[in-house]
Amino acid sequence: MQTSQFHWHYFEIQPAKGGRFGEFVDRFQDRPTVPFVVFNASGKKVVIPPGLYTWYQFSNEYISDPSTVISGSARYRTGGFYDGDYKSIEFTGAFRAGNRILGSTGWTHQIIDLRYGNFHNDLIPMKLSYSFTTLASIQALVQYNNQTAQVSSNIRLALLNRSGTGLFVVYNDRRDTYSADPQQVLGRSFIIKYTRLVDF
C-alpha cells in the first residue's frame, strides 16, 4: 500500500481573547495493492478493491480559548473518501480545575457512502489528567468505537525529570461490547518503561 497526504490551512482567525476559527483542505492519495476491509460490523463488510484513489476533504473548525475553565471545539468535514463521499461532525468539551486537573469528552460522527457499501461510525473519547507536579502526572483515556463495538482504556503514570525522561507506567485494556458476553476482555497489557538521557 502506498499513501500520501497534503494539508493546506488557507484561512484562520485568531481572536485576541484566545481560540481560533479556520478552514483547511486535505488531499489524500492511496494505492492499495490488495483488497482491504474498511468496515466490518454487525454482519456487514465493506471492502476497498486495489487501485489508485485520490480524494479531497474540506474542513471548518472552531476552537475556543483552551485556557478558560470550560472550553470546546467543533469541526465539520466534507468531501471524498476513496471513490465515495464522506461527511463528519466532531464536538469536544473540556474543563480545568486549577492547574492540576484537566478533563475532556467528545463525539465524532462519520457518514461514509461508497460504491461498495454505506456505513457510519461513532467515536466517543473521555480523558482525565491530574498533575501532582510539573513533572509527575497521571492520565486516563476511555474510548468507545461503535464500528468495532469495543471500549478501550489507557492509564498512564509519568514520573519525569527535567530532561523529559524518566519512569512511565502504562495499563491498557480492550473490551468487546457486541458479543454474547458484553464484558469480554480482548486484551490487557501492563508496561513499565524507564528512560534516561546519558551524556557522552
Name each region found by the language model.
Residues M1-F200:
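Exposed, low-structure sequence patches enriched in small/polar residues
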